[in-house]
Design a protein with these regions (language model features):
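Glycine-rich phosphate/pyrophosphate-handling loop used in enzymes and phosphotransfer proteins
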Residues: 1-187
Length: 187
């Protein structure tokens, strides 16, 4: 088995650059309102709309690989207890259902503080994830709600690489505007 790879649509254009994170749109307007509703006002009914946006961005990409599993970048336990759910898990399950794929929890987050409210430098030192070793190498799609610096999704990808993933693609519903983000691309 060779070294872990990113999918063609997630491969950075410059050699040695960090893994590219795709987002279906920028965090503005209606999308921002929907995500805030999901995260802070228990509006789980918006999951279907947000999942449709993610699936549309996948299907519009002619280079998207054939994924075998969908997972999510888990939110902190503090936030999950406050909300009663993990919004990224809900999104991942909805995306998997629309794509006819299995959704499994592959990642476990350390007990780090939530990213919300942290400044850019603090976010760059994002959470640490662990993943159980895979029985066989899978092509994994990792879903998250918002990408700001990319540290959360890159940490998730690193854990999956170490667990034996064949390919890891990273997709968020929305990215903060480029001037506040790092190495993310709106699909």
């Amino acid at each position: 088995m060779g070294s872990p790879r990113t999918c063609p649509s997630c491969t950075p254009s410059s050699v040695g650059a960090d893994r590219l994170i795709r987002a279906s749109t920028e965090l503005r307007g209606e999308t921002q309102d929907l995500i805030r509703g999901l995260k802070y006002r228990n509006q789980r009914n918006v999951v279907a709309d947000l999942a449709d946006r993610l699936v549309s961005s996948i299907l519009a990409d002619p280079h998207a690989p054939t994924f075998e599993l969908v997972t999510w970048a888990p939110t902190s336990m503090v936030r999950q207890r406050q909300r009663g759910y993990d919004q990224s898990e809900l999104l991942a399950k909805a995306v998997a259902g629309r794509l006819g794929l299995r959704c499994r929890r592959l990642l476990y987050r350390d007990r780090s503080a939530p990213q919300t409210g942290r400044n850019r430098q603090e976010r760059l030192n994002g959470p640490v994830f662990r993943a159980r070793p895979m029985r066989r190498p899978y092509r994994v799609l990792v879903i998250d709600d918002v990408v700001t610096t990319g540290s959360t999704l890159r940490a998730a990808a690193h854990a999956l690489d170490l667990a034996g993933a064949k390919e890891v693609c990273l997709l968020a519903v929305a990215a903060t505007p480029r001037d506040r983000s790092t190495n993310s691309r709106v699909a």
